[in-house]
UniProtKB/Swiss-Prot annotation:
GO terms for cellular component: tRNA-intron endonuclease complex. InterPro entries: Sen15_fungi, tRNA-endonuc_su_Sen15, tRNA_endonuc-like_dom_sf, tRNA_intron_Endo_cat-like_sf. tRNA splicing endonuclease is a heterotetramer composed of tsp-2/sen2, tsp-1/sen15, tsp-4/sen34 and tsp-5/sen54. Interacts directly with tsp-4/sen34. It comes from the Eukaryota. Residues 1-55 are annotated as: Disordered. This is Probable tRNA-splicing endonuclease subunit tsp-1. PANTHER family: TRNA-SPLICING ENDONUCLEASE SUBUNIT SEN15 (PTHR28518:SF1). The gene is tsp-1. Residues 30-55 have a biased composition (Low complexity). One of its GO terms (molecular function) is nucleic acid binding.
Amino acid sequence: MESGSTPPTDKQIRENEQDGTGHQGKLLARPTSTRQQQQQQQQQPSHSVSQSVSQSPQTQDCLTIVANMSADQHLQALTKVVVNNLENQHDWTQVQIHIQDNLPRPLIYGLPPKRLYVHPDEQIDIIRAEKQLNQRVPQEPELEWVLPLHLAEKWSISDFAAVFDAITALPPGGESVNANEDAQWQLWRGPKRGKRILLATVQDDSTVTYYWMHNGLVKPRQN
């Protein structure tokens, strides 16, 4: 065995701890356990964490502005996709973006190349008129409202109701027909026309699917 100093006994350690001196001029202390170290770390205040989490009012205002800008940019891009699809894929003309204070988002309206919707009761009036006139009644296209949506969005009934409450049955520039007892079928292009919107649902790959939505109940079409 190598020669060296004799290790201190437990009694010597206790004596050295009491008088403040250590063996060979050094204070001998028992090692601190892992649990004690964790308790000491928990007792220390974590100033760095609190500083990183807390935000000044100016920073919060900036984050709010950025969030609003992102939402506006999303709506602009969504509207642009639908307008492009209507004009280039479905040959719509007179396509306009409609912005209104009480609308939750911009709407689109335009003129399709052919008429897209005929009310079931209007269909009956047209058949009667064709029998009386002994000729076909022309079905000219009408201006239609379009609401751009993304497939991932979740809209409630109240959201759609707010849109219907904010619009008129005919988009701006639509020709309204006055009441005429001799041409009841024409009233469906004016006073009898209900509010309807073409939902333009955009998917992630820019594919657009269209659905009709009516304000109120509409009975099924008769074949």
